[in-house]
């Protein structure tokens, strides 16, 4: 077995990072929660302002609100919510030394005045819930 192509080497982490980013940017719930800083980001029209809220092209959020490096986009002049994904806590699998076991950590930041969506929902927790549905127990 060519050990350079196994999960034991950090070289595969780049591919895994892009797999995570792709899964996030293709999910409309995540994209809408990040893009639309409104009380109901899931509606096609904001009920308060009447502005259209079309589906979001997730590629526009990469390196701005969906981050694969632990640094927030510098040029932003507007309030935005962010997701940063990083790998953490690496250990070699004792049963299969060709694999490293790690934790994928998602850091979520939202402007304080955009947390409350309605009487029952908080934006960062809805983002966490959706990330959990997309990744918990799922292979990359």
What are the residue ranges of the model-derived segments?
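Small/polar-rich, solvent-exposed N-terminal microdomains that initiate assembly or binding
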Residues: 1-93
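Short, flexible/disordered intra-domain loops and linkers
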Residues: 4-6, 115-123
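Generic low-polarity alpha-helical segments
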Residues: 20, 24, 85, 106, ...
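Acidic-leaning, charged glycine-interspersed low-complexity segments
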Residues: 76-77, 122-140
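Residue-level marker of positions within ordered structural domains that often coincide
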Residues: 90, 111, 136
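Short histidine-centered beta-strand/loop micro-motifs
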Residues: 94-98, 120
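Oligomerization/assembly interface segments of phage tail-like spikes and tubes
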Residues: 98-114, 131
């Amino acid at each position: 077995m060519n050990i350079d192509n196994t999960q034991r080497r950090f070289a595969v982490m780049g591919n895994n990072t892009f797999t995570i980013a792709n899964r996030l940017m293709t999910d409309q719930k995540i994209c809408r929660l990040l893009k639309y800083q409104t009380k109901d980001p899931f509606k096609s029209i904001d009920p308060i302002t009447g502005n259209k809220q079309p589906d979001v092209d997730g590629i526009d959020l990469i390196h701005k609100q969906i981050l694969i490096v632990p640094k927030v986009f510098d040029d932003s002049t507007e309030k935005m919510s962010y997701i940063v994904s990083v790998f953490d806590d690496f250990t070699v699998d004792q049963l299969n030394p060709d694999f490293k076991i790690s934790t994928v950590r998602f850091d979520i930041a939202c402007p304080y005045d955009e947390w409350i969506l309605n009487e029952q929902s908080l934006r960062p927790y809805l983002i966490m819930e959706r990330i959990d549905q997309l990744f918990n127990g799922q292979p990359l």
